[in-house]
């Protein structure tokens, strides 16, 4: 038994001291980890800080699978995407660029990819490239994951105190949001690389443009949501613009909107500033209890705001029936917020608030599938659109919100 355990330990040690092919591992650089391993950083021993950065995504940009499968079968299943990459990199290096890899690898966090084996893969790729490279590996889904700029910020801290010139730098990646065309049978899986470059403020190119020297301007996007468009002074809070926030008589306001659309923030404002009583299923429980609470507040002479998603006729009818029965007017306030906008808001909250809950895309898609546009014929006295106008107390939060956060 002891002999078997010792043998297993020796095999594990041997695995760490050998490369992907079992050969003695040559130490070409060093590894470090941040935030409990959420970010892994490899720095070649001859890597130097430079003003100009030539940065690259990895999968689908520098390498592809040998097996021909979409995802690698193991950490040895790779080959360079273009034969010219080593010579292209040597020219970049001689032209004064620092070569950097930025890669999202959530499979490590999920336990689908072995962390130590992946480190060997990075070192093997760097060895194949033949020049000093620094690699940043985002393992989880936080601010290090592209298109967020956490990895770029860490690069700035590890550039030998040399200030980076973003205008002279470039990022190359295949997640460019390109659409399906006759020459491209499948659309890109995401916008992450293009948006990462935009957030950082560097030039962006696809692998076809950079390595393949393609001059074809492939169509992409446009993005489903651009946060910078929200900061127009022309946007009013309510539509129609003359809609009254507070009614002069007792009423029900029924909110409609995606999770993450800002409706709860709006409802809290009505509560704090205008003494509306908030009815919310997340805090009260069942819809039956919500209806009972609505009746109770109205009986006490209070106006009520229903802070639920209310996407369909059935969920809204419960409160319309109460309004009719008690002779109280009911208005519908619908958040003017798309699913992509809601995703952005949720991502922002998670990045800025450790206590914020992640809401899955599936939940948003369910809301979208159930959605029926509110109409006056349902029994509403007025339908008001509420435009999301973000406000910030922290300058860094505003800067983050204006970035692309969704892949």
Swiss-Prot record:
Q: What Gene3D superfamilies does UniProt report for this protein, alphabetically?
A: HAD superfamily/HAD-like (3.40.50.1000), P-loop containing nucleotide triphosphate hydrolases (3.40.50.300)
Check the record and name the InterPro entries matching this protein.
HAD-like_sf, HAD-SF_hydro_IIIA, HAD_sf, P-loop_NTPase, PNK3P, Polynucleotide_phosphatase
Pfam families assigned to the protein according to its UniProt record, in alphabetical order: AAA_33, PNK3P
Q: Which GO terms describe its molecular function?
A: double-stranded DNA binding
Region of interest: Disordered: 1-20
Organism superkingdom:
Eukaryota
Q: What PANTHER family does UniProt report for this protein, alphabetically?
A: BIFUNCTIONAL POLYNUCLEOTIDE PHOSPHATASE/KINASE, BIFUNCTIONAL POLYNUCLEOTIDE PHOSPHATASE_KINASE
Protein's UniProt name: Uncharacterized protein F21D5.5
């Amino acid at each position: 038994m002891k002999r078997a355990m010792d043998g297993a330990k020796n095999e594990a040690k041997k695995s760490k001291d050998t490369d992907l092919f079992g050969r003695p591992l040559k130490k070409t650089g060093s590894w470090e980890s941040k935030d409990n391993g959420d970010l892994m950083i490899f720095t070649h021993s001859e890597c130097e800080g430079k003003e100009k950065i030539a940065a690259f995504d990895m999968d689908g940009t520098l390498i592809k699978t040998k097996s021909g499968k979409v995802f690698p079968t193991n950490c040895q299943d790779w080959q360079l995407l273009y034969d010219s990459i080593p010579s292209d990199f040597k020219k970049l290096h001689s032209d004064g660029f620092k070569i950097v890899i930025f890669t999202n690898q959530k499979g490590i966090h999920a336990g689908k990819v072995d962390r130590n084996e992946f480190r060997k893969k990075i070192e093997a790729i760097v060895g194949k490239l033949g020049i000093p490279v620094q690699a940043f590996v985002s393992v989880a889904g936080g601010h290090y994951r592209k298109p967020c700029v956490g990895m770029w910020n860490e690069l700035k801290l590890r550039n030998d105190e040399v200030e980076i010139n973003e205008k002279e730098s470039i990022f190359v990646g295949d997640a460019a949001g390109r659409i399906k065309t006759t020459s491209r049978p499948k659309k890109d899986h995401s916008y992450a690389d293009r948006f990462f470059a935009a957030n950082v403020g560097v030039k962006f190119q696809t692998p076809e443009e950079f390595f393949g020297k393609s001059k074809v301007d492939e169509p992409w996007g446009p993005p489903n949501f651009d946060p910078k468009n929200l900061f127009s002074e022309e946007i009013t809070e309510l539509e129609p613009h003359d809609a009254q926030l507070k009614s002069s008589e007792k009423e029900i306001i029924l909110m409609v909107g995606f999770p993450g659309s800002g409706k709860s923030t709006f409802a809290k404002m009505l509560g704090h500033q205008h003494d509306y009583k908030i009815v919310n299923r997340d805090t009260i429980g069942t819809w039956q209890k919500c209806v009972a609470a609505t009746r109770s507040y109205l009986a006490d002479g209070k106006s009520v705001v229903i802070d639920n998603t209310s996407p369909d006729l059935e969920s809204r009818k419960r409160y319309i029936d109460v309004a009719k029965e008690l002779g109280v007017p009911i208005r519908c306030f619908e958040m003017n917020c798309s699913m992509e906008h809601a995703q952005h808001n949720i991502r922002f909250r998670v990045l800025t608030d450790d206590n914020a809950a992640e809401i899955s895309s599936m939940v948003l898609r369910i809301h979208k599938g159930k959605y029926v546009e509110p109409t006056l014929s349902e029994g509403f006295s007025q339908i008001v659109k509420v435009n999301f106008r973000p406000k910030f107390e922290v300058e860094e939060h505003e800067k983050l919100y204006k970035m692309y956060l969704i892949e």
